């Protein structure tokens, strides 16, 4: 507590490295609690302070550059799907056929799951059917936001579904490494909140936040939402659409 008094008004909001890390990864301001501006504290500190002004300039430069998330999604958007290359003739039709085939497989899996749970006596059958139908609707909305296929998400789905193909093993390894990176960040946020709660309880934060409640809320942040979300709609290998142009993905 004596150490906390020494901090004065200083807070995590003034952590240049954390803000830069979040920006470089691609945390959207709209996803921050209350849509907060991550640079507001630095703008105040930059007034009359040369070092803080330099930090602010560096953060503003980072904001002007493509984030890791944006670069990642631009990259997976160009994934060859069923041997069809991004922008090639007939690519849109080939991607649509793949997505429709996957969604049909997903629908069948959801229906089978609802039937099995009914046989096990797992609660109200009608509620389970509705729950699985909602899960399928979620898959449709994820792959076809506003009715249009997202080729980036289609690319992610293809990589995750056929990860054993030689050409897709290293892209899948990279995707999983980024998920692991964010998982580590989430674990750190949770551990930080528990440390604060253990030492100081639920006092108001030095930056004026609700303290531990605010820290717990930040552990819900997800930057690479699509990389996490795609795992919700995968189907077993035997249920996948039949692979076309398999030789394209070989050694």
Name each model feature, range by range.
Residues 58, 62-251:
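C-terminal accessory extensions/subdomains outside the catalytic/core fold
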Residues 2-79, 83-84:
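Extended amphipathic alpha-helical segments with heptad-repeat/coiled-coil character used for oligomerization
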């Amino acid at each position: 507590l004596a150490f906390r008094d020494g901090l004065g008004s200083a807070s995590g909001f003034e952590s240049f490295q954390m803000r830069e890390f979040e920006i470089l990864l691609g945390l959207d301001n709209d996803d921050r609690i209350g849509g907060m501006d991550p640079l507001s504290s630095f703008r105040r500190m930059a007034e009359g302070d040369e070092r803080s002004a330099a930090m602010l300039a560096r953060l503003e430069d980072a904001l002007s550059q493509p984030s890791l998330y944006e670069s990642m999604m631009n990259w997976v958007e160009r994934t060859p799907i069923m041997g069809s290359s991004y922008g090639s003739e007939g690519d849109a039709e080939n991607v649509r056929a793949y997505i429709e085939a996957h969604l049909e497989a997903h629908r069948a899996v959801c229906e089978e799951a609802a039937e099995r749970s009914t046989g096990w006596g797992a609660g109200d059958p009608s509620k389970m059917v509705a729950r699985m139908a909602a899960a399928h609707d979620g898959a449709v909305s994820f792959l076809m936001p506003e009715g249009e296929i997202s080729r980036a998400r289609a690319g992610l789905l293809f990589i995750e579904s056929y990860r054993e193909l030689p050409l897709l093993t290293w892209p899948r390894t990279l995707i999983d490494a980024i998920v692991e990176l964010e998982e580590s960040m989430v674990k750190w946020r949770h551990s930080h909140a528990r440390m604060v709660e253990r030492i100081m309880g639920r006092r108001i934060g030095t930056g004026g936040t609700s303290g531990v409640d605010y820290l717990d809320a930040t552990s819900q942040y997800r930057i690479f939402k699509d990389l996490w979300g795609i795992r919700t709609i995968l189907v077993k290998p035997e249920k996948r659409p039949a692979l076309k142009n398999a030789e394209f993905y070989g050694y």
